[in-house]
């Protein structure tokens, strides 16, 4: 949607041109009118560049930057076309019952009621659920508010989007739990569904601590993290080098996110090196000393 917001900036820049020529036609001082137009258009260019950078989410968005975003978003522009035509039935149902009379003044960035998508009761997790899930479920299913999405302090995911991603663990456990595994595979749901748990009990979806997780589930967590960090085929991030991935995982061990004993085994066994040789790109495989990460 950044292109829609860019178009609004274009409208304001065009309005500045119109105001300039109107002022000239009415006998105003051309030099001062030109300076006012050029200053406003330069300001709009700078403000859009800032909004676009917020959309990328490449750095921490401080409270000062969030305040600037709200200030920019408060600029007004005039809409002359009906914003209710051409919508699907569901989208139209989220709109207010009465359309705003045209022309309508809009803010440059908005969090509108129709941006808030309610979460169905069926998608909430009762505290006494039979699987033992302990996850904080956001009130909304989605919040598509423009300021809400641009004001994320770290990254680009809203609380609603992050929950949707994390929810894959819930679905994994629910689905696998319904399958009639033979005796020797009965631990599969726990192994597959526990790789986002942390040793200090702050992970998800059950907030299990180290002693509540099987060794295989703790191994799966290490394998999953290492693969995710080094994967070079993800559209949203480049793959880390071997040394970068191990440095991050060493920090995760210190923070009690992964099992320290199994991480040491992962390093001393050379599994990280074997995996790198088979699955990582040559430019990612740099020299490492395992002693630096123990």
Task: Identify what each model region corresponds to.
Residues 1-294:
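Histidine- and acidic-residue-rich, metal-dependent catalytic cores
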